[in-house]
Amino acid sequence: MLFRSVYGAIEIFFILLLIPVLTMKSMADEKHQKTDQLLYTSPISINKVVLGKYLALVTLFAIGLLIVSLYPIILQNLVRSVAEEGSTSYTVNYAVAYGSTLGFFLMGCAYIAIGVFVSSLTESQVIAAVAIGVINIFTMLMTSLANMLPSSKIFMVCFFAALIVLLAFALNFWIHNKWVSALVGLVAEIVLFVLYFFFSSHFDGLLYNVLSAISFTDRYTNFTYGILDVSAMLYYVSVSFLFVFFTIQRIKKQRYN
């Protein structure tokens, strides 16, 4: 319990403060300093530039986490000395300690990938930091927020219909083609209502189920009990890969424009 409480505080510090600070300059500063043009004309490919920035940030994160990983050893030595004085003994569960560290590292890599992508969308470091912080807070609290919303089928279908509209606008912002965006949105709305018509019973509490499935922190819970959740590990790696890919495509699009 002591270790989990300490790691909970470390998790909040890393995710809500350290990662936004680390990633806010990664791409936004290039635009602000107008050095992004050098990236576009560099003999090094955009893929390598983005991947290099991402891996550099992951390395910094890993160094910080490496220091934190000394805590279980220090704690064990501390409680051993206390036990020798006649107090109740306490043994650090290293499986829990380092399982949590591994899970937290992979989760942090995913958060860093998202942060780098958000940084590529703006030239303001402040806006990037705030946006990354808000996104990170949302991912930590989204299942709790979902519990506060109605779980009725009607609300669920209306919510996802509105979400599709927002995603269509986001797609238009990305590809600058309103007809393709409108078509994709229309097809998605049709699919949604067809699914609702035939499988309406599955829409009860659907939002909570979806958010639980994609929640970073919910998937991290197993690691805090010493369980190496392979599906969670693959999920974090997939999210990292996906957002690094999004960042590369974003930079390439700016280059061609």
Could you say what each language-model-derived stretch is?
Residues 1, 10-19, 136-137, 242:
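Hydrophobic alpha-helical transmembrane segments of multi-pass membrane transport/permease proteins
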Residues 253-257:
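Short cytosolic juxtamembrane segments of multi-pass membrane proteins
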Residues 19-23, 71, 113-115, 246-247:
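Hydrophobic/aromatic residues in alpha-helical transmembrane segments
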Residues 3-8, 14, 56-131, 140, ...:
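Secretory targeting signals
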Residues 3, 121, 128-250:
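Terminal transmembrane helical anchor/hairpin motif
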Residues 20-40, 53-54:
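Transmembrane helix boundary and interhelical loop/hinge segments in multi-pass membrane proteins
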Residues 47-51, 118:
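Alpha-helix N-cap/helix-start motif at helix boundaries, enriched for small hydrophobics
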